[in-house]
Amino acid sequence: MTERRQPSLSTDTLPTREAAAIELLSQVCRELDSIVFATSLGAEDMVLTEIIRRERLPIRIFTLDTGRLPTETLELIEVVERHYGTRIERYAPHPDAIADYVSRYGLDGFYDSVPARQACCRVRKLEPLKRALAGQSAWVTGLRAEQSVTRAELPAREWDAANGLEKINPLADWSEHEVWAFIRHHRVPYNPLHNQGYPSIGCAPCTRAITVGEDVRAGRWWWENPETKECGLHRREFAPRQPSAHPAIERDRSAA
């Protein structure tokens, strides 16, 4: 796998960042039961997969198989399972819900309007996520504050009122450079699309490569304004952390 090129910057902060992420996850595991990690197999999520498996943390890993993921992402799931000797659970949309969406909007109707795109995300992502989070105490994400304007005020730990559980963001204050320095240092597997100009990878028809100078999430739903570019998985409807109840428009992509 070709190494992704990164700026020549100091990595002095990386050990501190890594230790803080490990401590946060370890603390959450001491306090709560039934913790899950939602991975999209992006670079940040590969950092967390490495930490969770290396530290043997009791955190179950799952992904949302939307039915429209790039081939490279699907192949990476198998690579990760072999590399870490673990299983990534897959949650898929209900076929009837997909059929209803296609009947109303068309297979690629998400290009036509923000409501149509949000409806697709609800069917392919939000409903499967609800099933994955049911009965859990907390979920872990690879979100970083610098990724977009919708994530600028991201805390490391918060109460997810929409889903009724804690949400843990161990990489909230990490930079993109720190993420890639970690991947290089620990030889973590990652999606080859990152080497082709895709810093953020979602469903194949909704992701494009970015050009020099563009925001890291510019390739996600690129036909929309930045303020609407969230699928709803991480919408900002959060309350202060609650006390624990537990003890202790191009439609063709050449790369997909």
From Swiss-Prot:
Principal location listed in the UniProt entry: cytoplasm
Swiss-Prot/TrEMBL keywords: Cytoplasm, Iron, Iron-sulfur, Metal-binding, Oxidoreductase
Keyword Oxidoreductase: yes
GO molecular function, one term: adenylyl-sulfate reductase (thioredoxin) activity
Cofactor field: [4Fe-4S] cluster
Annotated SUPFAM superfamilies: Adenine nucleotide alpha hydrolases-like (SSF52402)
GO terms for cellular component: cytoplasm
Reaction it catalyzes: [thioredoxin]-disulfide + sulfite + AMP + 2 H(+) = adenosine 5'-phosphosulfate + [thioredoxin]-dithiol
Superkingdom of the organism of origin: Bacteria
Cofactor binding, per record: Binds 1 [4Fe-4S] cluster per subunit.
Entry annotated with the keyword Iron-sulfur: yes
Group of enzyme by EC: oxidoreductase
InterPro entries cross-referenced by the UniProt entry: APS_reductase, PAPS/APS_Rdtase, PAPS_reduct_dom, Rossmann-like_a/b/a_fold
Pathway(s) served: Sulfur metabolism; hydrogen sulfide biosynthesis; sulfite from sulfate
Active site positions: C231
One GO process term, biological-process aspect: cysteine biosynthetic process
Subcellular location: Cytoplasm
Family per record: Belongs to the PAPS reductase family. CysH subfamily.
HAMAP family associated with the record: CysH
Function: Catalyzes the formation of sulfite from adenosine 5'-phosphosulfate (APS) using thioredoxin as an electron donor.
NCBIfam families xrefs: APS_reductase, cysH, PRK02090.1
PANTHER family: 5'-ADENYLYLSULFATE REDUCTASE 1, CHLOROPLASTIC (PTHR46482:SF9), 5'-ADENYLYLSULFATE REDUCTASE 3, CHLOROPLASTIC (PTHR46482)
Protein name per its UniProtKB record: Adenosine 5'-phosphosulfate reductase
Originating gene: cysH
